[in-house]
UniProtKB/Swiss-Prot annotation:
GO terms for biological process: translation. PANTHER family: 60S RIBOSOMAL PROTEIN L12, LARGE RIBOSOMAL SUBUNIT PROTEIN UL11M. Belongs to the universal ribosomal protein uL11 family. Pfam families: Ribosomal_L11 (PF00298), Ribosomal_L11_N (PF03946). Part of the ribosomal stalk of the 50S ribosomal subunit. Interacts with L10 and the large rRNA to form the base of the stalk. L10 forms an elongated spine to which L12 dimers bind in a sequential fashion forming a multimeric L10(L12)X complex. Keywords: Ribonucleoprotein, Ribosomal protein, RNA-binding, rRNA-binding. One of its GO terms (molecular function) is structural constituent of ribosome. This is Large ribosomal subunit protein uL11. It comes from Halorubrum lacusprofundi (strain ATCC 49239 / DSM 5036 / JCM 8891 / ACAM 34). It comes from the Archaea. GO terms for cellular component: large ribosomal subunit. The gene is rpl11. InterPro entries: Ribosomal_uL11, Ribosomal_uL11_C, Ribosomal_uL11_C_sf, Ribosomal_uL11_CS, Ribosomal_uL11_N, Ribosomal_uL11_N_sf. Forms part of the ribosomal stalk which helps the ribosome interact with GTP-bound translation factors. Disulfide bonds: none annotated.
Length: 158
């Protein structure tokens, strides 16, 4: 490969403008073709920020690798809000069910350090706490303790 470009683009809505256009402009690839393929491959993440890597050759050929959106983006999409809280320990913006937390954990499982769904859910819980999202009506900062106590084994062990 002659070069690699990494960018965070809105799923299904990439354009030839920034951040892709200025990076791809001086390369031998057709910018419109790259943008079209990125939009096709990221359509399932419509509106979410998605990491993409474009590798290209001197002959104009290219390959695109689409990553999983950041955990915060998946949480925002699942819980239905646009921005986190300015005071996440005081002002809560949304509440998620344990099933929703599990869904996000499973979506992110390839990018997380956790070795099972329970620990992946605990990582998601940490992000919920920083965004001002409660889990099952409780402060997300206590989620780890509740998982360790087995409160959610019926859902997380499935």
């Amino acid at each position: 490969m002659a070069g690699t470009i990494e960018a965070l683009v809105p799923g299904g809505q990439a354009t030839p403008g920034p951040p892709l256009g200025p990076e791809l402009g001086p390369t031998p690839v057709d910018v419109q073709d790259v943008v079209a393929q990125i939009n096709d491959e990221t359509a399932a993440f419509d509106g979410m920020e998605v990491p993409v890597t474009v590798e290209y050759d001197d002959d104009g050929s290219f390959t695109i690798e689409v990553g999983v959106p950041p955990t915060a983006e998946l949480i925002k999409d699942e819980a239905g809000f646009e921005t986190g809280s300015g005071e996440p320990q005081v002002d809560f913006v949304a509440d998620m069910s344990i099933e929703q937390v599990k869904k996000v954990a499973e979506q992110k499982s390839t990018d997380l350090l956790a070795y099972d769904v329970k620990n992946a859910a605990k990582e998601v819980g940490g992000t919920c706490a920083s965004l001002g999202v409660t889990i099952e009506g409780e402060d997300a900062r206590t989620f780890d303790d509740r998982v360790d106590a087995g409160d959610y084994d019926d859902v997380l062990d499935e």
